[in-house]
Amino acid sequence: MGEHENEGTLILDATCAPQNIRFPTDVSLLNEARLNTEEIIDELHGIGAFGSKKPRTYRQVAKNQYNSFSKSRKKSKKMIRKAMRQQLGYLRRNLKMIHATDKKLREELSAKLQERLSVVEVLYAQQKEMFEKGTHRIDERIVSLSQPWVRPIVRGKQNAPVEFGAKVEMSVVNSYLRIEDLRWDAFSEDTTLQTSVESYRRCFGHYPAHVLADTIFRTRENLRYCKEHDIHISGPRLGKRPADLSVYHEQLREE
């Protein structure tokens, strides 16, 4: 325990701060990446990277195919796979042409295009792997080319099972809100409880008497920690609910 008697209540909760990005789909991301590579090819051609003849990119064909797909109201899995295969093919061809140029000439690209090229390369590798494996999950998945640090955060809500933005853990003490943790990658809230409590102690000179938090915070390690510091943490006991529901409801009332 701390030097002083525990006082106050610490409320903990986590949420996602939605980022202002277009809802990502595999086909739309690949189409945007293709457009980016076409812009890069145009700039490289302007500085003589391909000689006098500009290479063919089939951009009009690729554009027509994407527009035809995007205008379809009902997109079957077969249609999505076909559109992805098409855009992956054009993107692969464009990247191959870009990397066939002199590296010194590529370094003459604007800083913005050089940065975008590196993001497009990662996106292509991710999308190719997911397409070949028939999955929609991959580590560090890019969902926005302009904001490549944004990650999908699984929330499990009925209307928004996945959100895109920073995950934020917050605390409330005496009606004041404080950000305890903010990350662009998904993290489990239970790992932040102890650091939040210790932050409370440094701020107020003592531990809180109560911690109010969702069930996810009530891990065995966190319960042990709270017991060790004489902190009451809200919520039902771990384990299976009692067969007698009246006992379970009594536990909730006590909390």
Predicted regions and their residues:
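Anion-binding and metal-coordination hotspots
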Residues: 1-255
